[in-house]
Design a protein with these regions (language model features):
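Low-complexity, glycine- and small/polar-enriched segments
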Residues: 1-203
Length: 203
């Protein structure tokens, strides 16, 4: 039996601290959390009578991305305020096994990916933001999992092969202005206020 196990706990955050007073031409608060990973396992078993082989690829990931302007802050920027949280996770997981036996051959594989992603962009309670030209609060999450399993078995009397691929994905993506916060964009050429969230998981 061959096993490959990967555990990832990755946190990225960017913020303007509680109670801060910030002025300037522009303000960008950006958290960008990007992870690419590959987990692979291969097994080979051979025996004169019985050949058994197994391979398991297990990946456990926690991805946390946070961008925010804190509580009771005062922010003023003539040409815009951007609060951006972006999470991008790509996982490749493969497992393969071959069992060869004179009488019985068996090959079994399993590939499992467990992913929890939390992405948030926000203005916290009682934050006052004058973005001048614009206020843009955006949270986006892209989760892309590609896995493969291959099993083979050769036996003079009996052969058995089996593959299992499992994805457990839990994602939460939020963009918001908390209660009692204030957002404004008032210049003559103002683009306005945008609060957007997107979550994409190709399967």
């Amino acid at each position: 039996l061959t096993a490959a196990v990967e555990v990832v706990d990755k946190k990225v955050s960017a913020s303007v601290g509680d109670g801060a007073n910030v002025t300037g031409d522009t303000l960008t608060v950006k958290a960008d959390n990007t992870t690419e990973s590959v987990t692979a396992a291969a097994g080979l078993g051979a025996g004169g009578t019985v050949g058994l082989a197994g391979a398991a690829s297990e990946t456990f990931v926690t991805h946390t991305t946070d961008a925010h302007v804190g509580k009771n802050t005062q922010v003023s920027a003539v040409n815009g305020v951007d609060i951006l949280a972006h999470s991008n996770f790509t996982q490749g997981a493969t497992a393969g096994s071959v069992g060869v036996g004179g009488t019985v051959g068996a090959g079994l594989t399993n590939s499992t990916v467990s992913f929890t992603g939390d992405t948030a962009a926000y203005a916290d309670e009682k934050a006052v933001i004058d973005g001048g030209k614009k206020v843009n609060i955006s949270a986006s999450q892209l989760t892309n999992v590609d896995y493969g399993t291959v099993a083979g078995a050769v036996g003079g009397t009996a052969s058995l092969s089996g593959t299992v691929g499992v994805n457990v994905l839990k994602t939460t993506t939020k963009a918001y202005a908390a209660g009692s916060s204030q957002l404004s964009a008032k210049t003559a050429d103002a683009e306005g206020i945008a609060v957007t969230a997107s979550d994409e998981t190709p399967l």
